[in-house]
């Protein structure tokens, strides 16, 4: 990357939350607690699934990968955000900026596909129960998870590669708390039409495709549940889907808010707030959502609690 006078860009200055700098101590403690809770919760989910034989099913296979992805993408942005509360100048080397976005974009995209797969799993279980073991075999599920990581890697690599080819002549101050593509494009003096097009195409296609998979899966699930004659069967099916549906609603609701904002100064600040929720709060909520509404998880946690205390 070069500036307009051919001076090489070696670092970026992350503006973060300059307007709230007087509350840095409170914000630091709050987001540190959220981050620690997120890491412990998701690590606990992974550990529980891999050590308890009751969780050796395909549903939990997807869940442990979702927990892993949540750990990775929140760890890509939260530590640097915490640093912005304690340092007056939050500088980041160009190489670090590239790595940060590459990791974040890879796992954030993978998260979308994993949530979509976790909608397909109950669809097959409820709508096609006799064919579940054939359609959702372990080999198929491994390929689906691998595909989610591949899609994440492709999206991140393309976005990063085209962003690295830009020249900068305006400033090296990024109006964000981490290195995201839109605020970086705003600093470029190169033609960014291709970059914007790629951003819209990749982000749009990933969100639309995974969103449609989730929507149609739940349309068929709800239609099948409503046809059930047994009220107990309907209640059990609704309970099976409730946790995932809650997580999906929060996830896509936040993304919709982020990308439907107008490009004003106020919307940039609102975008930061939305990104905080998306990048730090949602990874913390997912373990709570899936454990609090899951009897097997709650029973396993009670057993562990009795052993420890």
UniProtKB/Swiss-Prot annotation:
Belongs to the G-protein coupled receptor 1 family. GO terms for molecular function: G protein-coupled receptor activity; odorant binding; olfactory receptor activity. It is found in: Cell membrane. It is a multi-pass membrane protein. One of its GO terms (cellular component) is plasma membrane. The chain crosses the membrane at residues 26-46, 55-75, 100-120, 134-154, 197-217, 238-258, 272-292. It comes from Homo sapiens (Human). The gene is OR5AK2. Pfam families: 7tm_4 (PF13853). PANTHER family: OLFACTORY RECEPTOR (PTHR48018). This is Olfactory receptor 5AK2. PROSITE patterns: G_PROTEIN_RECEP_F1_2. Residues 47-54, 121-133, 218-237, 293-309 are cytoplasmic.
């Amino acid at each position: 990357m070069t500036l307009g006078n051919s001076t090489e860009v070696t670092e970026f200055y992350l503006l973060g939350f300059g307007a709230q700098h007087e509350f840095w101590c409170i914000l630091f403690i709050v987001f540190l607690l959220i981050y620690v809770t997120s890491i412990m919760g998701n690590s606990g989910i992974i550990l529980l699934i891999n050590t308890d034989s009751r969780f050796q099913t395909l549903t939990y296979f997807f869940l442990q990968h979702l927990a892993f992805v949540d750990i990775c993408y929140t760890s890509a942005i939260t530590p640097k955000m915490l640093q912005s509360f304690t340092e007056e100048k939050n500088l980041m080397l160009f190489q670090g900026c590239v790595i940060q976005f590459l990791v974040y974009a890879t796992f954030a995209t993978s998260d979308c596909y994993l949530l979509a797969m976790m909608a397909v799993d109950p669809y097959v279980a409820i709508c096609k129960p006799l064919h579940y073991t054939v359609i959702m075999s372990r080999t198929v599920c491994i390929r689906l998870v691998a595909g989610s990581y591949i899609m994440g890697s492709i999206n991140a690599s393309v976005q990063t590669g085209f962003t690295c080819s830009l020249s900068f002549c305006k400033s090296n101050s990024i109006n964000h708390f981490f290195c995201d593509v839109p605020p970086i494009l705003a600093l470029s003096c190169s033609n960014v039409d291709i970059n914007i097009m790629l951003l819209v195409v990749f982000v749009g296609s990933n969100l639309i495709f995974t969103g449609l998979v989730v929507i149609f899966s739940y349309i068929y699930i709800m239609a099948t549940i409503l046809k059930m004659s047994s009220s107990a069967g309907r209640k059990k099916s609704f309970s099976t889907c409730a946790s995932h549906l809650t997580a999906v609603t929060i996830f896509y609701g936040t993304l919709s808010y982020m990308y439907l904002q107008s490009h004003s100064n106020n919307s940039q600040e609102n975008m930061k707030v939305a990104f905080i929720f998306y990048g730090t709060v949602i990874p913390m909520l997912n373990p709570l959502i899936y454990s609090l509404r899951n009897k097997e998880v709650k029973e396993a946690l009670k057993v562990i609690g009795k052993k420890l205390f």
